[in-house]
From Swiss-Prot:
Keywords: Nucleus, Repeat, tRNA processing, WD repeat. The lineage of its organism: Eukaryota, Fungi, Dikarya, Ascomycota, Pezizomycotina. Signal peptide: none annotated. This is tRNA (guanine-N(7)-)-methyltransferase non-catalytic subunit trm82. InterPro entries: Trm82, WD40/YVTN_repeat-like_dom_sf, WD40_repeat_dom_sf, WD40_rpt. It comes from the Eukaryota. It comes from Aspergillus fumigatus (strain ATCC MYA-4609 / CBS 101355 / FGSC A1100 / Af293) (Neosartorya fumigata). Forms a heterodimer with the catalytic subunit trm8. The gene is trm82. Required for the formation of N(7)-methylguanine at position 46 (m7G46) in tRNA. In the complex, it is required to stabilize and induce conformational changes of the catalytic subunit.
Length: 502
C-alpha cells in the first residue's frame, strides 16, 4: 500500500460557540479545503467544499479591478465544477484555488470568514450546529486579500490587500452596491469600409471576414450594461504591499468608559501606520518607523494594549509604545554571531494558565519563524521589554496555533511534509499517520524561566489519524516547488537589492 503525504494545516482556529447546546470546534484549512473537527474528541465532522451538486449554482459578487478602464463588477452564475475522484473513491470538487491562507472566526462562533488564494475571494460561512459550513456569500476582491479582521461587534470586515488598500464591507452581504452603476454609451464601432463587392482575392476575403467578426464582437460589448457589485468602502491605503492589519480599541480616559478604535497596518516598505478607526480612518495618528526590512506581523497584547510588537524580515522584533511612536526595545531572534536571514511568520499574545486547576496566569508572546520548528517564547514585562523564556520544540515547522477554551494548552499545526528547519527539502518518506497538530502546555514550575511540555492528548491524536487530503509521494521537483511556495511565500517580500523595489 502506497503511503502519501498529507496536506499540512495552514490555519487552525478554535471555535467556542456561545449558543447553548452547540459543540465547540476546531476549524482548519489544508490545501484547498476547510475541515471541521469536534473539539472534545478530534473527530472530523465536515469538509468544505463538499462534492459538487449539479443542481446548484452560486451567485458570485465581483468587485471592479483596479486594473483596466472598465469595472468587472457584476453578478454571475458559476457552473458546478467537474468532479474528481479522491482517495477511497469519494468525489472531490475541483477548485479555482489551491490554498486557503486566512481564516477568521466571529467572537460568538457563528461565522467564519475565509480567503481563498488564487481567485481573490472573501467567503463568509455560517457554522452550523453539526459542524458543517454553509456558505453565505463569496465576494471577489479587487486585489488578493493579505489580512482580514472583524470589527464593530463582528458586523464589519476590514480587508487589507496586496495593492496596499484597506476596505470595509459588511459581514453579511446586503446586496447593495457601493459603486455607482456605469452605463456604457452605445458607441458605433468602426465598421470596415471594404465589402465582398470590393475585395476579391482569397487572402483579402479572409482578412475582411476576420474584421467583420471583430466588429460584431465590439458591437455586442458596446451595448448598455449596468454594473453591479457588493457593498465595499475604501477606507485607507498604502503605497506598498500591505502585509498585516490589526484593529484595537483603547479607553479614551479612565472615567468615561468611551473607547477609541485604531487600525494598525504594516507594509513591505518597513512602515507601520497607526490610523483612527472608521469613519475617521483617513486620519493618521502616527507612524512606527524603525524596521529596515519588510514587516510581516503585528501584535497588540490584549492585557497591555499600549504596546505593539512587530516583526518581519529583520533579525529582531521591535516593541513599541505606539501612541508615542517610541521604540522601546529591539529583541534579537538569532543567537549572537549567527549570520542568517529570518522571516517572522506570526506573533501571538496569549494569556495561559500555568497548570490545570491553577488560578495563576502567564502572559506570553509566542513567535513563529518561517521554516522553523521552534516557537520562541517571551514574557512582556511591566516596562514594555520582552524577556526570553524557554522555546517550544515541535516535530516540524510551525505553521499556526490556537488556544482551546481552558487556556492551559496550545494546539500547534506543524509541517510533516518538509524536513524540520527547511522550506524546500521534503522528508524522504511520509509517515502514517501524519503529524498535523501537536499540543503543548506550561510546566507548573514556580521559579525560573517558563518551560513547556508536550501533552499526549487523545484529541490531537484523533485529528492526526483523520488526516486531510493526500499529496502524492511521486511529485516531480517542479510540483514540489509550487507547493513549497504556496506555504512559504513570506521570504519573497524581501527586496533583492537594498534601496530598490524589485
Amino acid at each position: 500500500m502506497v503511503v502519501n503525504y498529507q496536506h499540512p494545516i495552514q490555519c487552525i482556529r478554535y471555535v467556542e460557540k456561545q449558543t447553548a447546546g452547540f459543540r465547540n470546534l476546531f476549524l482548519a484549512s489544508a490545501g484547498s479545503k476547510i475541515y471541521t473537527y469536534a473539539a472534545e474528541t478530534g473527530r472530523k465532522l465536515a469538509i468544505w467544499p463538499e462534492a459538487p451538486n449539479a443542481s446548484h449554482s452560486t451567485v458570485v459578487s465581483v468587485a471592479p479591478s483596479s486594473e483596466g478602464d472598465e469595472p468587472s463588477a457584476k453578478k454571475r452564475k458559476v457552473s458546478p465544477v467537474p468532479e474528481q475522484t479522491a482517495k477511497g473513491g469519494q468525489p472531490e470538487a475541483s477548485t479555482a484555488w489551491s490554498t486557503i491562507p486566512i481564516l477568521t472566526v466571529s467572537s460568538d462562533g457563528n461565522f467564519l470568514v475565509a480567503v481563498t488564494g488564487e481567485d481573490k475571494c472573501l467567503r463568509v460561512f455560517e457554522i452550523e450546529e453539526s459542524g458543517h459550513l454553509k456558505q453565505l456569500s463569496e465576494r471577489h476582491m479587487p486585489k488578493r486579500p493579505s489580512a482580514i479582521t472583524l470589527v464593530d461587534d463582528d458586523k464589519t470586515i476590514l480587508c487589507g490587500d496586496k495593492f496596499g488598500d484597506v476596505y470595509s464591507l459588511p459581514l453579511i452581504d446586503t446586496g447593495k452596491s457601493s459603486i455607482a452603476p456605469k452605463i456604457h454609451a452605445k458607441m458605433k464601432p468602426n465598421q470596415p469600409a471594404a465589402t465582398t463587392l470590393t475585395v476579391h482575392s482569397k487572402r483579402n476575403l479572409a482578412s475582411l471576414e476576420q474584421q467583420l467578426r471583430h466588429y460584431s464582437q465590439n458591437e455586442k460589448t458596446a451595448e448598455e450594461k449596468p454594473t453591479s457589485a457588493f457593498e465595499l468602502h475604501l477606507i485607507l491605503g498604502h503605497v506598498s504591499m500591505l502585509t498585516d492589519l490589526v484593529y484595537v480599541s483603547v479607553p479614551v480616559d479612565a472615567t468615561s468608559g468611551r473607547q477609541r478604535p485604531y487600525i494598525f497596518t504594516a507594509d513591505r516598505d518597513e512602515h507601520i501606520r497607526v490610523s483612527r478607526g472608521p469613519p475617521q480612518a483617513h486620519i493618521i495618528e502616527n507612524y512606527c518607523l524603525g524596521h529596515t526590512s519588510f514587516v510581516s506581523s503585528l501584535c497588540v497584547p490584549q492585557w497591555a494594549p499600549e504596546y505593539l510588537v512587530s516583526g518581519g524580515g529583520d533579525n529582531h522584533l521591535i516593541v513599541w509604545r505606539w501612541n508615542e511612536s517610541r521604540l522601546v526595545q529591539k529583541v534579537p531572534l538569532l543567537e549572537e554571531g549567527t549570520d542568517s536571514e529570518v522571516v517572522v511568520r506570526r506573533i501571538w499574545a496569549l494569556s495561559l494558565t500555568k497548570a490545570a486547576n491553577s488560578q495563576e496566569n502567564a502572559n506570553v508572546i509566542l513567535v513563529a519563524l518561517d521554516g522553523s520548528s521552534k516557537l520562541l517564547c517571551f514574557t512582556l514585562e511591566s516596562d514594555g521589554s520582552l524577556k526570553a523564556q524557554n522555546s517550544i520544540q515541535a516535530s516540524g515547522n510551525v505553521l499556526d496555533l490556537t488556544v482551546p477554551s481552558e487556556n492551559s494548552s496550545i494546539v500547534v499545526s506543524v509541517d510533516a511534509v518538509r524536513e524540520a528547519g527547511s522550506t524546500q527539502e521534503w522528508r524522504t518518506s511520509p509517515s502514517s499517520p501524519s503529524t498535523l497538530v501537536e499540543a503543548f502546555r506550561l510546566k507548573p514550575a514556580s521559579e525560573g524561566p517558563l518551560d513547556w511540555e508536550r501533552t499526549s492528548e487523545a484529541i490531537t491524536a484523533q485529528i492526526n489519524s483523520e488526516g486531510t487530503s493526500d499529496i502524492s509521494a511521486d511529485l516531480d521537483e517542479k510540483q514540489k516547488k509550487e507547493l513549497n511556495d504556496s506555504l512559504y511565500s513570506l521570504g519573497n517580500l524581501r527586496k533583492k537589492n537594498m534601496g530598490e523595489d524589485d
